[in-house]
Amino acid sequence: DFLFARTMIGVFKNIEYMCSRTSSKTWGKDAWKKIVVCVISDGRAKINPRTRAVLAGLGCYQDGIAKQQVNGKDVTAHIYEYTTQVGLELKGGQVSLKPRTGCPVQMIFCLKEKNQKKINSHRWFFQAFGRVLDPNICVLLDAGTRXGKDSIYHLWKXFDVDPMCGGACGEIKVMXSHGKKLLNPLVAG
C-alpha cells in the first residue's frame, strides 16, 4: 500500500501541475479531463489487502462484487471506473486518505482474476484500454516509482515537440529518506 500510494501521489501531483499550466494550448484547468490513470493489478488473490483498501478509499474499488464466474463462464478481469476527489498522504509509513485540494482524477482499476505477470498486464493496458481510450501517449509506472511533480509533463513534452518520437524514458534516482546513507557503493553511485 505504501509503494502504491507513493506512486499515486506522484501521479496526482503531475495532473495538478498540468492543470496549473493555464497559458498552455493543451493543458490548463480542465487538463484532468484529458488524463486517465489506469491501475492494473495482477491477480485478485495476490493483491495486497491494504492496497485494495486504498483503492476503495479512492472510490475505484468495491469489495465483494468480483466473482470468479458469471453464468458459468470464467471471469478474466474486473474493471472499476471512478473520478476521484480523494487524495493520499504518507505519514510515518502509513497511508491515509485526505480531501483533494487540486483537480479531480479519472481512474480505471483493472483487477485481473489470475496472476499472469507484468508483461500480460502491459498487454491488457495496450490491447484493452489503449484501443478504447486511444491515447496520444502512455506512461507506464511500477508501484513504488514516484514521479517528480512535473516528470510526466516533461515526458509528454518530448512527444509534443517531436511527433516522430516513438518512445521516451525518465531518469530514475535512488530514494534515501531522512539523510540515511547508502552502505552499498554500487547502489549509492
From Swiss-Prot:
Segment forming the signal sequence: none
GO cellular component entries: cell septum; plasma membrane
Subcellular location, record wording: Cell membrane
Membrane topology type: Multi-pass membrane protein
Biological process according to GO: cell wall organization; chitin biosynthetic process
Entry keyword set: Cell membrane, Cell wall biogenesis/degradation, Glycosyltransferase, Membrane, Transferase, Transmembrane
Catalytic function, reaction form: [(1->4)-N-acetyl-beta-D-glucosaminyl](n) + UDP-N-acetyl-alpha-D-glucosamine = [(1->4)-N-acetyl-beta-D-glucosaminyl](n+1) + UDP + H(+)
Record keyword Kinase present: no
Disulfide bonds: none
EC number: 2.4.1.16
Pfam families cross-referenced by the UniProt entry: Chitin_synth_1 (PF01644)
Any one Gene Ontology molecular-function term assigned to this protein's record: chitin synthase activity
Family: Belongs to the chitin synthase family. Class I subfamily.
Job of this protein: Polymerizes chitin, a structural polymer of the cell wall and septum, by transferring the sugar moiety of UDP-GlcNAc to the non-reducing end of the growing chitin polymer.
Protein name (Swiss-Prot/TrEMBL): Chitin synthase 1
Organism of derivation: Aspergillus niger
Encoding gene per record: chs1
